[in-house]
Amino acid sequence: MNSTSFSQLENHSVHYNLSEEKPSFFAFENDDCHLPLAVIFTLALAYGAVIILGVSGNLALILIILKQKEMRNVTNILIVNLSFSDLLVAIMCLPFTFVYTLMDHWIFGEIMCKLNPFVQCVSITVSIFSLVLIAVERHQLIINPRGWRPNNRHAYIGIAVIWVLAVASSLPFMIYQVLTDEPFQNVTLDAFKDKLVCFDQFPSDSHRLSYTTLLLVLQYFGPLCFIFICYFKIYIRLKRRNNMMDKMRDSKYRSSESKRINIMLLSIVVAFAVCWLPLTIFNTVFDWNHQIIATCNHNLLFLLCHLTAMISTCVNPIFYGFLNKNFQRDLQFFFNFCDFRSRDDDYETIAMSTMHTDVSKTSLKQASPLAFKKISCVENEKI
């Protein structure tokens, strides 16, 4: 997850090439290192599909939530923030990374050289900590429902803090990212004359390693451990739940409902960890010993790891939105250019959002068993 995966995926040739031990370690100097056209075409299709799904999925999710005023609760506000950051990743990370890795030189100018890795790092940090805040909201909702629970104001404050933290942690890219022709000065190939590369130029290797290690903890291991703990506690609580609503339902329905919720919670954590694990491993190995990765295999291996990580921008809308019946209905209305309308009596809050009901605790106690069962079923759908 380390954000330098994006800058260093841009830098990978440069670090090899500037090595004193192997000054001619350029992948582009060896014709055998070029990827076959069939592989490039397949990767282009895959990247294109992820970009389209990531942009359209997150954009639709944002529009649907913003359109429905009744959906602006804590979780949905955080989901909009998550989708917006994923949208930036899909726009800023995928196309620039793919083109630069294949071409081995930068064609997008000095401003984009600094802005691209900066925006990428900001977006990824925001995405991860949005997942953290959603886990916190869910934890308080299920583990401590009578204690402190975040409201919309808390959500907006949390989002502001996330963006400030993300910008601050990404500033080194704006400071140390440079556009230069230094790696190409001794290259004899005419195709690489007057070409430029974009890479980070830290004061020393120790500075670079310290920063990349910090990002590794900040953007992967730290959030992942925290999210896992939150959802594990939620899983245990849901498994042990034996309240009045559960007793009113038959065991088969209770078992299937509990299983559905637990699988969704587990899938969120697994998707986050699995999507980013290959790139995290690749980036860590590259940071500490880049010579361990064969030059000719570097670009292909990196692109595969990077593509896997970018799939997470498509997974989140599915988990947080499109598995919900209302989003399926509203999405259909969206593509049919219809109004986003829904009746209060059949509208289901987005999965993972704060549960609420118009029925008070007093009326709940006075309700008939049949009515209570119906209310409890609706309540669990809202969980």
From Swiss-Prot:
GO molecular-function terms, A-Z: neuropeptide binding; neuropeptide Y receptor activity
Keyword vocabulary terms for this entry: Cell membrane, Disulfide bond, G-protein coupled receptor, Glycoprotein, Lipoprotein, Membrane, Palmitate, Phosphoprotein, Receptor, Transducer, Transmembrane, Transmembrane helix
Residues bearing glycans: N2, N11, N17
Lipidation sites (S-palmitoyl cysteine): C338
Record-listed Phosphoserine modification sites: S368, S376
Localization of this protein: Cell membrane
Residue ranges, Extracellular side: 1-34, 109-116, 176-211, 282-299
Side Cytoplasmic, residues: 56-87, 138-154, 233-260, 321-383
Gene Ontology CC: one annotated term: neuron projection
Mode of membrane association: Multi-pass membrane protein
CDD domains from the UniProt entry: 7tmA_NPY1R
InterPro entries given in the database record: GPCR_Rhodpsn (IPR000276), GPCR_Rhodpsn_7TM (IPR017452), NPY1_rcpt (IPR000351), NPY_rcpt (IPR000611)
Family to which this protein belongs: Belongs to the G-protein coupled receptor 1 family.
Function: Receptor for neuropeptide Y and peptide YY.
Designated name of the protein: Neuropeptide Y receptor type 1
Species per Swiss-Prot/TrEMBL record: Cavia porcellus
Lineage start: Eukaryota, Metazoa, Chordata, Craniata, Vertebrata
Name of the gene encoding the protein in the UniProt record: NPY1R
